[in-house]
């Protein structure tokens, strides 16, 4: 691959992330569900359907990406996302929302680890893997800018034309993302997985993770921050409604969240020279504190703090991803990330169920405080158990 073709592939990847991330309904999807008479527990049940099937598909899909083609897997992932969008647009009860969640689980499983593995291997082919954090940060930055525009526009469209309109319009941008994925050039990486069977490849990746215990600490860090992030990201809309924030403002609030993601991803690589242990400890504290303050304040001012878990996760994401990818071989990247996503969903299912039950039986505010306490408990475990192990990794890196 020449310099020109490398740059072209990277920019096509950026464009793919932009159109894939241009989802007009993310700022109002829970409001659509509530308008169609779903309770918070119903919404969590839809999420559980997504999570359970993601657990089933996660590892096999990662192996498909490692053994077949990453660009085709990226394209198919968007096709299933389009099916999810269509089903939710026409859903009138929980059953179609659940079927849509099933399609979304396939989409998410196919995407998991495939996009970052494609990017890392593209850079590795040209010996530029040291720029991975920065390049991944750029991709997230551009995707987040698109999401900001989509969030604001989607809320306005929903306010003027109805809650279903943003779903229909999103399909156009998703179709363009499919075409962009198909135009990508597959990096020429030696695929050692051709020498083993499909299931042997999965087992060998699992054994690799099992034999490197210090990786556990990185994995559990991203699992806890990522699983709890979903509760702030997905159910923040319900908090906003309960503190009296009007729907048309939701797009601007989503823009704030996406702006945090964009800026965090863009500049987090500058933190690579600092102590990973101290950075991660601080970010866990920020995440837990954000949940507690959000639930305790019970006001529009409390909505400010719901963005702290997003800040913590998106600052950590490129750093943790880089640490993990340096440990995986090329043929194990997507499968390894799929194992991590599986663990994330394993944690998310009981946490989300507890969140939904507390939100329905007590209040959304109490549910957020409980999540904050859960993150606080992990902070204690991280400081006592993981801090030194993370320090060992950063010594190797520096």
Spans of features found by a protein language model:
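Cytoplasmic helix-loop-helix junction between adjacent transmembrane helices
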Residues: 102-144
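C-terminal transmembrane bundle of multi-pass solute transporters/carriers
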Residues: 46, 59, 71, 239-398
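C-terminal ends and interior cores of transmembrane alpha-helices
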Residues: 79-93, 97, 285-298
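Helix-loop boundary and gating motifs at the non-cytosolic
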Residues: 2-56, 212-255
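Juxtamembrane intracellular "pre-TM" segments in multi-pass secondary transporters
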Residues: 1-7, 185-219
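Hydrophobic core of transmembrane alpha-helices in multi-pass small-molecule transporters
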Residues: 18, 84, 95-111, 301-316
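Conserved MFS/SLC helix-loop-helix module at the cytosolic interface between two early adjacent transmembrane helices
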Residues: 55-92
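Helix-loop junctions on the cytosolic side of multi-pass membrane transporters
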Residues: 163, 170-196, 384-396
